[in-house]
Amino acid sequence: MGLEEKLPGGVLLTTVEKLANWSRRSSLWPATFGLACCAIEMMSTGAGRYDLSRFGMEVFRASPRQADLMIVAGRVSQKMAPVLRQIYDQMPEPKWVLSMGVCASSGGMFNNYAIVQGVDHIVPVDMYLPGCPPRPEMLMDAIVKLHEKILAGSVSGKVEHTKVGSAPYPKPIEVATAWSGLPAGAVDTRTLSVNDRKRFSLPEDAPVPAGRGAVEPVLDERRPAAIAPPSVFGRGKRVPVDAKPTDESRAGGPGPSTETLTDD
């Protein structure tokens, strides 16, 4: 006499892991995290034509504490990298990450100092989706494959993701130096502010690199004159840019001691 003869009809036997993973797969709530044009395809997937709600994913949450899946749709800039990591840390376990499009997966066409060359430098990625941008059918296929991975997972402890490098995420200047082909220790001034850029600028007597040609310096005396506000230098007065107002000029007098040009 088998076990099925002792149990009443309608009883289904399964394991706790299968039941828990089935529940996770059937109620996967994505976080609202569209970064670029791939987000348009992600929104189309959630609309009525493709109906992502068939997979229990129609609820896009604006709060990371209520989301299970982060769909990184679009390229990740250097300034967005710490924000993305913070949102990922705020998501409760278990959580998954889907990299949508080549820009999110590897930087895509934006191979420069401003874009992170792959979101897996910041967060662990469970599913990579190619395309520029991927169609809604491709996103749904990636989600189905992620469902299969969730069903095969374990409920004990944390969910195993693809590992991120053990080193902390580098600063933008360090990343730009590594990606731009500059020698070690060099600084890519494109990532600096205007004030910091002056500290790394070449001196006036520095030799010009070969192939670039000499650049004629702009002398102070060649600067064009600017029309000063009437409240400072008097109405209709034209003075050099470097000229400073005097007490006499404030009262509408002849102006600063330097040469003053009139409208005549």
Curated annotation (Swiss-Prot):
Binds 1 [4Fe-4S] cluster. InterPro entries: NADH_UbQ_OxRdtase-like_20kDa, NADH_UQ_OxRdtase_20Kd_su. The keyword Transport applies. GO terms for biological process: aerobic respiration; electron transport coupled proton transport. It is found in: Cell membrane. PROSITE patterns: COMPLEX1_20K. It is a peripheral membrane protein. Keywords: 4Fe-4S, Cell membrane, Iron, Iron-sulfur, Membrane, Metal-binding, NAD, Quinone, Translocase, Transport. This is NADH-quinone oxidoreductase subunit B. It holds the Pfam family Oxidored_q6. SUPFAM superfamilies: HydA/Nqo6-like (SSF56770). It comes from Parafrankia sp. (strain EAN1pec). NDH-1 is composed of 14 different subunits. Subunits NuoB, C, D, E, F, and G constitute the peripheral sector of the complex. The keyword Iron applies. Its main location: membrane. Residues 239-250 have a biased composition (Basic and acidic residues). Gene3D superfamilies: 3.40.50.12280. Its cofactor is [4Fe-4S] cluster. Belongs to the complex I 20 kDa subunit family. [4Fe-4S] cluster binds at C37, C38, C103, C132. The gene is nuoB. One of its GO terms (cellular component) is respiratory chain complex I.
